[in-house]
């Protein structure tokens, strides 16, 4: 355990506390077991280390990575037992999906060590309610997104902007600080700002994240063969060159040499992993989601990384809107326009010259325009949807 402690100390020393992700103040840190899920590269590890560094006594805390060589000869339950006997109170386990029997052993730790507070992070691919060791009734779960435009401005440019609600956007109640130029950094955010990487070759780093997700995270979770993992990568390449598009599962299945049902499963894995977003129809009621109508890449930064020279600005705009809204509210395809939120608000997304033809006589219809700084009437600037968290 000495080496684990030494590694932990080194990571704490290297952790900056000058910027906090939106999730930092949303987590109930008093819960006995907390799970933080999210795509690779969005800052889960940094958030955990910041909390320990700022809020907890070092002697009561231990942070470990589930892939540490220590676990080649020790079980997670053994570590928890030893840590508890030493008076430990707060155990943090990073990238839990890399530990084979993670669900079973977390359940045992929860049941046998009431004195321990346990937090684990993992890939968004994981389903904690799956299998015999259901953690959903024990762990308080959170899902973390990549950077919003608001967070990007604070992290990389020192610009502070308050979080806005959808209602404020629709009612034109957003107060823009004096001197703030909302479009100055927006294009850069769309191209490279979703992931909190500040140095080096950003494009290469994102490609590494994508490769690790497809080649390691998803196959581990879904017990996929190497051949199927290759098909995942081919499917993502097809989506990157075509998104957004109405999926023809049979046609895609023919290209991948798998059944249409398998295509749907592969798309579900990519979506859970934070690589694509699937826009569905509504089948009665806000939560009644139907068939997939369109498939998008998850965020604009992925478009610029994976689509190469075939980047369409209209696709970037729609992807940004869908990405920034769907994690906090139900978003479905609109029968008359682009998007329907909460089953009642219709949004048409476009450029500065976008007309309102499709929204004439539509109650709760809004036009979302790129390249404008302020809104009026039912027109909302696109950048403002980056202020929701």
At which residue positions do the language-model features occur?
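Accessory nucleic acid-recognition modules appended to NTPase machines
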Residues: 194-337
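Conserved lysine of the Walker
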Residues: 44-45
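N-terminal pre-Walker A segment at the start of P-loop NTPase domains
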Residues: 1-26
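Structural recognition of the conserved hydrophobic beta-strand(s) that form the central parallel beta-sheet
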Residues: 92, 117-123
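Short glycine-rich substrate-engagement loop in P-loop NTPases that contacts/grips substrate
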Residues: 58-90
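Interdomain motor-coupling "hinge/lid" segment immediately C-terminal to the ATP-binding subdomain
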Residues: 2-10, 123, 130-236
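Conserved catalytic cores of phosphodiester-cleaving nucleases, focusing on short active-site segments
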Residues: 321, 325, 339-353
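Hydrophobic anchor at the beta1->P-loop junction of P-loop NTPases
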Residues: 36
């Amino acid at each position: 355990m000495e080496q684990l402690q030494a590694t932990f100390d080194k990571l704490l020393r290297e952790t900056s506390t000058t910027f906090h992700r939106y999730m930092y103040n949303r987590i109930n840190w008093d819960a006995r077991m907390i799970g933080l899920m999210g795509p690779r590269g969005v800052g889960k590890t940094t958030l955990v280390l910041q909390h320990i560094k700022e809020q907890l006594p070092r002697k009561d805390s231990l942070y470990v990575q589930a892939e540490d060589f220590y676990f080649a000869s020790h079980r997670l339950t053994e570590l928890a037992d030893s840590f508890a006997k030493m008076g430990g109170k707060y155990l943090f386990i990073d990238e839990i999906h890399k530990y084979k029997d993670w669900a079973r052993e977390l359940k045992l730790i929860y049941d046998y060590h009431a004195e321990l507070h346990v937090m684990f992070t993992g890939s968004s691919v994981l389903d904690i309610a799956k299998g015999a060791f259901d953690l959903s009734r024990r762990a308080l779960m959170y899902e973390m997104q990549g950077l919003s435009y608001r967070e990007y401005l604070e992290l990389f440019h020192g610009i502070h902007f308050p979080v806005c609600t959808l209602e404020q956007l629709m009612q034109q109640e957003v107060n823009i600080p004096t001197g703030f130029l909302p479009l100055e950094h927006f294009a850069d955010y769309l191209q490279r700002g979703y992931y909190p990487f500040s140095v080096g070759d950003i494009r290469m780093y994102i490609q590494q994240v994508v490769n690790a997700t497809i080649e390691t995270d998803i196959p581990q979770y879904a017990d996929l063969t190497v051949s199927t993992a290759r098909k995942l990568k081919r499917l993502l390449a097809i989506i990157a060159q075509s998104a957004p598009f109405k999926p023809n599962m049979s046609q895609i299945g023919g290209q991948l040499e798998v059944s249409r049902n398998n295509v749907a499963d592969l798309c579900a894995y990519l979506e859970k992993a934070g690589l694509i977003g699937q826009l569905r129809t509504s089948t009665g009621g806000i939560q009644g989601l139907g068939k997939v109508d369109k498939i998008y890449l998850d965020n604009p930064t992925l478009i610029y990384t994976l689509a190469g020279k075939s980047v369409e600005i209209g696709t970037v705009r729609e992807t940004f809107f869908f990405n920034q809204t769907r994690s906090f509210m139900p978003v479905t395809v609109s029968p008359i326009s682009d998007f329907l939120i909460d089953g009642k608000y219709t949004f048409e997304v476009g450029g500065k010259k976008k007309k309102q033809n499709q929204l004439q006589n539509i109650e709760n219809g809004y036009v979302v325009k790129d390249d404008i700084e302020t809104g009026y009437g039912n027109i909302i600037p696109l950048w403002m949807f980056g202020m929701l968290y």
